């Protein structure tokens, strides 16, 4: 089986920075058509404005917590590339939780951003994959990859909301994998350890001790760069993983 994604069409959310940006760049470099989605239109323009003149890359700015925005993203992808083969749900947010504050809304905010956005986009994209595969009697119709975190299993008090949302995303991955298997659509997740994303950069600025703590509890003794983790996502997107679904691959050093 091949690791190639050449000629495939992918939607990558969270593609304005960090891991989502690294995944989108690798996919484009490997010959895929890529629709880069994010809420930060200015950053999308900075990262992808020049590339969007190339026929293989487009970008879409919008709040994917809104269902109409999700529908518009899928429509824009079809208008640009006529199909969608791969979805990477990479849009994530990390905020702290005060477990004893009854006014704290972080759990509901993170469930909406990190779980429900991925679920709704998965539903829309899966419906499109099924429709475009109506005349394809065999072979996979699509691959969906959710970006999770080892916080789903290993947490700390202030990350309670993020951990709950990550665990829910992983269970959604397993459930959707079962629901879509008969449609020949695979659904998997990659759970990352410490990756120097924009959100982690902000966190270690506020909590300087976190950097040393992360390094001390990571056997390889360092924080990964986004570019180190993109091959696993490409593996799950490609035919090389055609008999893998419902799995959560952990990459944590």
Q: Where on the chain are the PLM-derived regions?
A:
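C-terminal substrate-recognition "lid" of short-chain dehydrogenase/reductases
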Residues: 222-251
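Substrate-binding pocket helix/loop in short-chain dehydrogenase/reductase
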Residues: 98-99, 103-111, 159, 214
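Active-site loop immediately N-terminal to the catalytic Tyr-X3-Lys motif
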Residues: 100, 154-160, 182-183, 221, ...
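Active-site helix of classical SDR
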Residues: 122, 165, 173
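Residue(s) in the substrate-gating loop at a strand-loop-helix junction
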Residues: 149
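Alpha-helical segment proximal to the catalytic Tyr-Lys
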Residues: 127, 178-182, 242
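Conserved glycine-rich Rossmann-like NAD(P)H-binding loop of the short-chain dehydrogenase/reductase
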Residues: 30-46
